[in-house]
Amino acid sequence: MLQISHLYADYGGKPALEDINLTLESGELLVVLGPSGCGKTTLLNLIAGFVPYQHGSIQLAGKRIEGPGAERGVVFQNEGLLPWRNVQDNVAFGLQLAGIEKMQRLEIAHQVLKKVGLEGAEKRYIWQLSGGQRQRVGIARALAANPQLLLLDEPFGALDAFTRDQMQTLLLKLWQETGKQVLLITHDIEEAVFMATELVLLSSGPGRVLERLPLNFARRFVAGESSRSIKSDPQFIAMREYVLSRVFEQREAFS
């Protein structure tokens, strides 16, 4: 379980997050949404252990987070892949740094690439891949270390609408198969409503938790309902419009 208690953080000398309290249970998919500048990415970087926080506590499985760790896998919008390495070696790179022997890490890479739909692409280079394929490699790399918690920072923001829909459904299937805790940062309201088991709305900066909304659309999808059917459901449309109105309220307040 991820537990965040009374978290305060600065960014560039200015308050970024104020009194954040969140809990992410095992097997849940938490989505954080808010206007630009609300501290979404700062929150993810704090959980990942990339930057220090001023006050409060972040704990995963009862252990305080004070730096990066293999129990947390991170996927970024820009992927951060190594262009001089092929797909297989990109996925296995972290395992190599961890001292895992070659045959084992290549087998792990093969298995996670199969999970993300890239079986057979092991020897291709990053420049030979589409944007969606590169994000699949980024997700596979994060999964290779078998983390407890998967953190994703707007991973589909630069993709076209069709590819973004494919990646959303892939992530939901991986979430169902692995049972991992997932925290997704996004600025896309429809994506947030579709994918979250709990949606957290942040205020304009400094970010505070405005509202926490339990949702069931992701569970409906993994139970077999199509994304098209879900997104055309009046309940989904009403929730999307409600969330949109809350985000607009914050944008107007900030401006």
Curated annotation (Swiss-Prot):
It is found in: Cell inner membrane. Keywords: ATP-binding, Cell inner membrane, Cell membrane, Membrane, Nucleotide-binding, Translocase, Transport. The lineage of its organism: Bacteria, Pseudomonadati, Pseudomonadota, Gammaproteobacteria, Enterobacterales. It comes from Shigella boydii serotype 4 (strain Sb227). The keyword Nucleotide-binding applies. ATP binds at residues 34-41. It is a peripheral membrane protein. CDD domains: ABC_NrtD_SsuB_transporters. It comes from the Bacteria. This is Taurine import ATP-binding protein TauB. It catalyses: taurine(out) + ATP + H2O = taurine(in) + ADP + phosphate + H(+).
